């Protein structure tokens, strides 16, 4: 398995010490333009990207970058540059959660789908208790000329490796391994007992198409079956954590594509786009392994870093505004992180 501590420290060594802060051993904050900062990250070294870029459509002056682009196309071109870098730095089995507005969702997905498999589009409903509903309760309904945008979107995606929907790195590797040792998909299905009845598994054809991912037990059976045929030792098989995209949910989590997490209530010093810790934890727990590296390229006040630390992950936060860099440093230094793993 990849030595995550070594990878993490290697990544951080590439940044200027004047703009790098380490409020916790496993939490780093880098000040600057994340599009440029990402170029210093080695390829295929980040496990999960969880990030909240400017929405553009909301046009809020108190969010850096939200009013930067006059045309939608300029904003989309800018975001496409991020997508290219995200794919380069993500591990082959990495994932991305990218927040966006409902208005820009489809245009962004169109750009992202050039480099990523769009696995889900999550609707965050933002429910709140009476008295904390903001403009939803106060605004005059008769003035509406379209449905009130009470939700936000989160695009969940993984790097695409092929020309068809869902083509994945593992799927391509499995097919090449099978061809190398001359074992049919049907025979491998028989050996592993994966007939598609288990949602986490699916038949070999589904794994190769990228529609499903094998469980740890199924992957072990795959490797053992292939090793018997690989008499010349031609194949080096990665550990499960280095090739299978993590996706681990249970009944205690929000596991559908509708997420109901209350918004962060107003407090002195609150970031205008701050996301709730429990929502971020839901994504991190599902789509990363313990000790993985989580990157937020628009980190704001450091919520993603706090959520990552609480689940035993390492974090790298990139933020362009010095005000929020300092707020993040203070937050992570003073917050008592409760480990939830």
Locations of the language-model features?
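Charged C-terminal helix
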Residues: 324, 340-341
């Amino acid at each position: 398995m990849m030595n995550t501590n070594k990878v993490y420290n290697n990544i951080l060594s590439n940044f200027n010490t004047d703009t790098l802060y380490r409020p916790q051993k496993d939490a780093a904050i880098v000040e600057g333009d994340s599009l440029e900062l990402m170029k210093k990250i080695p390829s295929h070294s980040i496990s999960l990207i969880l990030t909240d870029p400017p929405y553009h459509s909301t046009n809020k002056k108190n969010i850096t970058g939200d009013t930067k682009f006059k045309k939608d196309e300029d904003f989309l071109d800018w975001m496409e540059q991020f997508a290219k870098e995200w794919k380069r730095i993500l591990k082959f089995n990495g994932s991305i959660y990218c927040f966006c507005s409902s208005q820009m969702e489809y245009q962004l997905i169109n750009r992202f789908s050039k480099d990523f498999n769009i696995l889900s589009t999550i609707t965050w409903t933002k429910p709140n208790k009476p008295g904390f509903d903001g403009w939803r309760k106060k605004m005059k309904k008769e003035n509406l000329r379209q449905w009130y945008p009470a939700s936000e979107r989160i695009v969940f995606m993984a790097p695409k490796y092929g020309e068809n929907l869902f083509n994945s790195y593992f799927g391509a590797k499995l097919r090449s391994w099978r061809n190398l040792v001359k074992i049919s998909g049907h025979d491998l299905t028989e050996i592993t007992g994966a007939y598609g009845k288990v949602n986490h598994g699916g038949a070999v054809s589904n794994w190769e198409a990228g529609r499903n991912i094998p469980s740890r037990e199924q992957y072990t059976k795959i490797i053992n079956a292939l090793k018997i045929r690989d008499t010349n030792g031609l194949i080096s098989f990665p550990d499960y954590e280095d090739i299978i995209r993590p996706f681990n949910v249970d009944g205690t989590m929000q596991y559908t594509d509708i997420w109901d997490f209350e918004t962060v209530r107003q407090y002195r010093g609150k970031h205008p786009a701050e996301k709730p810790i429990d929502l971020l934890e839901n994504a991190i727990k599902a789509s990363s392994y313990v000790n993985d590296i989580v990157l937020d390229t628009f980190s704001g006040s450091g919520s993603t870093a706090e959520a990552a630390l609480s689940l035993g992950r390492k974090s790298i936060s990139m933020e362009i505004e010095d005000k929020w860099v300092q707020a993040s440093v203070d937050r992570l230094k003073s917050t008592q992180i409760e480990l939830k793993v």
